């Protein structure tokens, strides 16, 4: 597929990042469940703030950087392997590690419905954003559009988790998605120009919640 095939690229992004794509993203909250239990996120405003913080300064930003680097390195087996190693090393908790690796494995398996040589270049246990970036590049899907779709899917997943945890209603969730559009566009543009030197986060509360979720008693989510 050529980079000019806009409709084909859109259709593939919609398929790959749809909640119906069989990767199991619905079962992860990224520590939000613990933050809700601790009272740190208790309403729609708090959920919206949580989302924006992760986009600008947390795991969603770092994942976008990894995706962009994998997209640019999609034909370089060594670079993809090194990027995957770094992505796994920077997972902030055991659950976060399992989340990104299991989602990556599931994505690669499901993406085999669109055969391409890039699937053979990806290492085992490729983190989710690395897998998406490489596969999107292999199919000629533009980087910035891939980043925007990936970030939107990440926000949607968090919002869905917040709704299931009872801190926001469906109307609130839609409002958060609408309010996040400008931030998603901004972060996608920044990430498209990023290098691995731009990795970094400042979300101690979210990272700590992800760690503490491992010992949470009653829970709905795997992270």
From Swiss-Prot:
It comes from the Bacteria. GO terms for molecular function: nickel cation binding. InterPro entries: UreF (IPR002639), UreF_sf (IPR038277). It is found in: Cytoplasm. GO terms for cellular component: cytoplasm. The keyword Cell wall biogenesis/degradation does not apply. The keyword Transcription regulation does not apply. Keywords: Chaperone, Cytoplasm, Nickel insertion. Its main location: cytoplasm. Belongs to the UreF family. Required for maturation of urease via the functional incorporation of the urease nickel metallocenter. UreD, UreF and UreG form a complex that acts as a GTP-hydrolysis-dependent molecular chaperone, activating the urease apoprotein by helping to assemble the nickel containing metallocenter of UreC. The UreE protein probably delivers the nickel. This is Urease accessory protein UreF. It comes from Agrobacterium fabrum (strain C58 / ATCC 33970). The lineage of its organism: Bacteria, Pseudomonadati, Pseudomonadota, Alphaproteobacteria, Hyphomicrobiales. The gene is ureF.
